[in-house]
A protein has these predicted regions:
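Structured segments of extracytoplasmic/periplasmic soluble domains
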Residues: 38, 53, 110-112, 137, ...
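Bacterial N-terminal signal peptides that target proteins for export
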Residues: 1-13
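Active-site-adjacent mobile loop/cap segments within catalytic or ligand-binding domains
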Residues: 69, 262, 313-414, 429, ...
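Signal-peptide-cleaved, periplasmic/extracellular N-terminal interaction regions immediately downstream
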Residues: 2, 25-182, 428-431, 436-444
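Catalytic-core regions of hydrolytic enzymes
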Residues: 152-307, 318-331, 386, 409-444
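Flexible glycine-/small-residue-rich
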Residues: 50-52, 71-73, 109-111, 133-136, ...
Length: 444
């Protein structure tokens, strides 16, 4: 009897002692494992890696401008990263303990900013994340600041930039001929590394290097301009890539990628276009599904997604665009074939989101298999990247010489008729595509 009373008394004493301890013993704090900052020309993204979903509050402060993120019952593990001096929005990042148990992260801002914040669930690459997107309240001032920062010789040398700011200038109206605009899209970026080779080569780095080389070659052609959809290591949502190409009134959209497969012996290049029906193969269907997951990996606020195609009538315009996409893709595939081994000898088709522009012929080029050790090594090689850029340019030039957009320098020379081109396309275009394309004009 007395032993039971003593045991109960001891348990009550232990419980009372635990209740007297600080709150962090009673309830474990959520760990913030670290942060990443992605600096894009028109926005800055700060990502906090959190161990679990967490109550948080985001609010701005003035004089000087700051952004505060308060996280309830949280602690920071490690240090916060430094901020690139070229960032037009954020000048510093710091943290401190608040009210004993909470974590406060403060972002020192260079100017007032629009703020969006949202949490992301875990995926194959990352765990739980808290994302804060900042964009300038005055976009014009931000663009000027970004242009000034990019003009620094040190930064230009570091980025390997060779393009002139004039390459994005608006074409004059009137009787003058306009330039052909090619949107060059480096796949993945920022939070989304894409495929990763056995030696650690990241697809997002390889695609950006090739895209820059291709853009530089396009800009050197008379009557042509390139628009880089991504010109740094930051995330661009798939539909935003389409929107940027359409904003610049591109005549062609080329998305550059590096393929991956479980079998490391698989190798070679492939070229894909949008399908208005089913995929041409299970492999094409699988690849499209993988690439379309980029938004989930890179981080898109699903509550705010707005389909750029929702208000556009796609019927005949989309069909004509797909036809021209296939023709342009065959020209590029032919040049890649002359460079070396191709994985798919015919154009493949599937439902790639990034190719769904209703009025811009679009293609996705898998330059090589980054999962193949030999091809991974070649993809890292600057000389091979140059060869790929040359092949892509050659195919693009062949297409525009045959189908010159009205009002451009290319339109002065002779062009092939759709009927003459159809026979040449039969050997390269996969099932489901038409033979004779309709001519496309900008604005169709």
């Amino acid at each position: 009897m007395w032993k039971k009373i003593a045991t109960i008394s001891s348990l009550l004493s232990i419980a009372a002692a635990l209740m007297a301890l600080p709150g962090q013993v009673m309830a474990a704090q959520t760990t913030v494992h670290g942060a990443r900052i992605w600096n894009a020309p028109d926005h800055t993204r700060i990502v906090l890696d959190i161990a679990a979903p967490i109550p948080y509050k985001v609010f701005p402060l003035d004089n000087p401008p700051r952004l505060v993120v308060d996280l309830t019952d949280a602690r920071l593990k490690g240090k916060l990263p430094g901020v690139d001096s070229s960032d037009v929005l954020v000048s510093g990042l710091r943290s401190g303990v608040r009210d004993g148990d909470d974590l406060r992260v403060v972002m020192d801002l260079k100017q007032a900013a629009r703020i969006k914040s949202f949490e992301l669930d875990p995926n194959d690459t990352y765990g739980h994340r808290l994302v804060i997107d900042l964009s300038p309240k005055d976009p014009g001032a931000a663009m000027l600041a970004a242009a000034t920062a990019t003009a620094s010789p040190a930064i230009l040398k570091q980025q390997g930039a060779t393009r002139s700011p004039a390459s994005l200038s608006v074409q004059p109206k009137g009787g003058r001929q306009r330039d052909v605009i090619v949107a060059v899209d480096a796949g993945h970026g920022g939070e989304d590394p894409g495929a990763v080779g056995r030696s650690g080569t990241r697809e997002k780095d390889v695609t950006l290097a090739i895209a820059r080389k291709l853009a530089a070659r396009i800009d050197k052609q008379k009557g042509m301009q390139a628009v880089l959809i991504r010109d740094g290591d930051y995330f661009v949502a798939l539909r935003q890539r389409i929107s940027k190409a359409r904003k610049h009134q591109a005549d062609l959209f080329v998305s550059i990628h590096a393929d991956a497969f479980t079998d490391p012996s698989v190798r070679g290049s492939s070229v894909y276009t949008l399908s208005n029906g089913g995929a041409t193969s299970e492999a094409a269907k699988w690849l499209a599904a993988r690439e379309n997951r980029a938004d989930l990996i890179g981080g898109v606020n699903l509550a705010e997604r707005n389909d750029v195609l929702a208000s556009v009538l796609l019927d005949m315009t989309q069909n004509a665009t797909i036809e021209h996409s296939s023709i342009a893709a065959t020209r590029v595939l032919a040049k890649l074939r002359s460079l070396g081994h191709v994985h798919q000898t015919r154009i493949q088709q599937a439902g790639f989101v990034v190719l769904k522009s209703p009025d811009i012929p679009s293609m996705l080029v898998e330059t090589a298999f980054i999962s193949n050790p030999d091809e991974e090594k070649r993809l890292r090689n600057g000389s091979y990247q140059n060869q790929l850029a040359d092949s892509l340019l050659g195919g693009i030039l062949d297409y525009f010489r045959e189908y010159p957009p009205p009002g451009t320098r290319f339109a002065r020379g002779p062009s092939r008729s759709p009927d003459a081109a159809s026979d040449a396309n039969d050997d390269l275009i996969g099932p489901g595509s038409s033979d004779a394309p309709n001519l496309l004009a900008r604005g169709d």
